[in-house]
From Swiss-Prot:
Annotated segments matching region Disordered: 1-82, 328-361, 394-498
Residue stretches of biased makeup (Basic and acidic residues): 1-10
Lineage of source species: Eukaryota, Fungi, Dikarya, Ascomycota, Saccharomycotina
Gene name as annotated: SHE3
Compositional bias ranges of the Polar residues kind: 397-406, 425-449
Function: RNA-binding protein that binds specific mRNAs including the ASH1 mRNA, coding for a repressor of the HO endonuclease. Part of the mRNA localization machinery that restricts accumulation of certain proteins to the bud and in the daughter cell. Required for the delivery of cortical endoplasmic reticulum into the emerging bud.
Protein name: SWI5-dependent HO expression protein 3
């Protein structure tokens, strides 16, 4: 390779390489050039070849590790190659001169290029600063532009709103103008009416004053009349107070008399109650209920035996609520009375065995009743007050132990049970179903078996009290009288349906 080619290649490389790399390669080249003249001045043996080979050999002599061996060989060959070495040295001096010239040129060019590079770098820094400032300004301008655009949009919206408000205000103005015209017209009318009203008001004031004087006179007259009326009313109140006092005294007297009458009525009611209770005791209602039971049973038995149909009237009679209540009460009372009778019978037997012989038959207790002088029988004949008779089912025969029937049964139904024990008659307080306040009234009757109208009549007419007939509801039993002939008819009594 020739020196010019190497120079051209170095120039091309310097042009192609960046500025920093050119500076570093130029420093290495200058250092090699400073050390090359001393090495070239030393003697060296060059074995034929190209210029590049000699240059490389001389460079290797100065830098390789076998420099002593090369010096010895060069001394040996010094005599033989003295002629050729002078030529080579001259050629090398020429090349060195050319290279120094080229190197100087290159250094000058490199210094110029370095100055240009520094200038370009300074320009580039300035340009970069300008670019950054311009970018910053661009950002600021873009933000400003965005703000302006937003403000423009807001102003456009405000403008539209203002336009709408303007339109509304214009329409309102038109409406208000119309209203103003109307109000002005109405104002003129009102002014005219006001003038008319003022005239009317003045006339009313005049009339008011006239009527005021007139009514004041009338009020004074009314006050006078009112004072007269108050005096009259005070006198009337005094009179009424006196009359009220008299009336209160009379009312007190009336209350006292009423209380006395009430006490008298209560005493009369107590007398009536005692008489009714005595009449009920004489009637002996539980035995009648037992008689009703046995007769009902007999009727049902006879109808079954004779294959007869029981009439509907009898069925309705049997289904009567009051009779069912009486039956239920009689069964409960009969159970109690039977237990009491058994205890009394056992006590009597024990007493009879302890006292004396047991062959004596117990006497039958006969209940005697007094007949009031005002009582009448069914035939209308009166009985004297001194006549006393036996009980309702009277009989004076003593009972034997073999003929004693079921306690509580009545005669006339079964011949075997026609006689009763003395203990079968129960006190009216236990056997009377009407004595309890909770017992229901029978077909509008009061608790003594009488109708309320009859009870009031009996209070007014005590002579008719003992003549009142007691009849079971729903039955056609003949009236019970105090006739002594009733003992003969007791076996022939029957219950008939409605």
């Amino acid at each position: 390779m020739s020196l010019e080619d190497s120079r051209i290649s170095n120039e091309d490389d310097s042009e192609l390489l960046p500025p920093n790399k050119v500076v570093s390669s130029h420093g290495v080249f200058m250092a090699s050039m400073n050390g090359s003249p001393q090495k070239i001045m030393r003697p060296s043996s060059v074995s034929g070849g190209s210029v590049n080979g000699s240059v490389s050999g001389s460079s290797q002599i100065g830098s390789g590790p076998n420099s002593n061996n090369n010096n010895n060989s060069s001394n040996n060959n010094n005599n033989s190659g003295s002629i050729s070495s002078t030529k080579v040295i001259e050629a090398l001096h020429e090349q060195i001169d050319a290279l120094t010239n080229t190197n100087l040129k290159l250094t000058v060019q490199s210094q110029g290029l370095l100055e240009k590079l520094e200038n370009s770098q300074q320009r580039e820094g300035k340009f970069m600063e300008n670019i950054a400032s311009l970018r910053h300004e661009n950002d600021n301008l873009s933000t400003m532009l965005n703000r302006k655009t937003r403000k423009l949009k807001d102003t456009e919206l405000e403008l539209e709103e203002l336009k709408e408000k303007f339109d509304k205000i214009t329409t309102e103005k038109k409406v208000l103008d119309d209203d103003l015209n109307k109000t002005s017209a109405s104002e003129t009318k009102l002014k005219e009416e006001m003038s008319m009203i003022e005239n009317q008001y003045n006339s009313l004031i005049d009339s008011h004053e006239y009527y005021k004087d007139k009514y004041l006179q009338e009020i004074n007259q009314l006050k006078r009349s009112l004072e007269d009326l108050t005096t009259e009313q005070e006198n009337y109140l005094k009179r009424t107070n006196e009359n009220n006092k008299l009336v209160e005294e009379k009312i007190d007297n009336y209350n006292n008399s009423f209380n006395q009458l009430k006490e008298i009525n209560e005493s009369l009611n107590n007398i009536i109650i005692t008489k009714c209770e005595s009449a009920i005791q004489e009637l002996d209602l539980p035995n009648w209920v037992n008689l009703y039971k046995e007769s009902k049973i007999l009727v049902i038995d006879y109808a079954q035996q004779m294959n007869l149909e029981i009439p509907n009237n009898f069925k309705e009679l049997v289904r009567d609520r009051t009779l069912e209540i009486l039956e239920s009460r009689s069964t409960s009372m009969s159970s109690q009375s039977s237990s009491e009778n058994r205890q009394q019978f056992n006590n009597n037997n024990n007493n009879s065995h302890n006292q004396s012989s047991g062959n004596e038959e117990p006497l039958r207790m006969v209940k005697l009743r007094t007949v009031s002088p005002n009582s009448f029988n069914n035939s209308g004949s009166s009985l004297p007050s001194h006549i006393k008779r036996s009980s309702f089912y009277g009989g004076t025969k003593s009972l034997s132990s073999s003929n004693s029937g079921i306690p509580g049964t009545l005669p006339g139904v079964k011949r075997s049970g026609s006689l009763r024990k003395p203990s079968s008659r129960l006190p009216s307080t236990n056997t009377e179903p009407f004595s309890s306040p909770s017992s229901p009234s029978l077909n509008g009757t009061n608790k003594f078996g009488q109708n309320q109208n009859q009870a009031s009549n009996s209070n007014s007419n005590p002579s008719q009290h003992n003549n009142s007939n007691i009849q079971l509801p729903g039955s056609r039993v003949s009236s019970v009288s105090h006739n002594p002939m009733h003992r003969k008819k007791r076996n022939s009594m029957m219950f008939h349906g409605n």
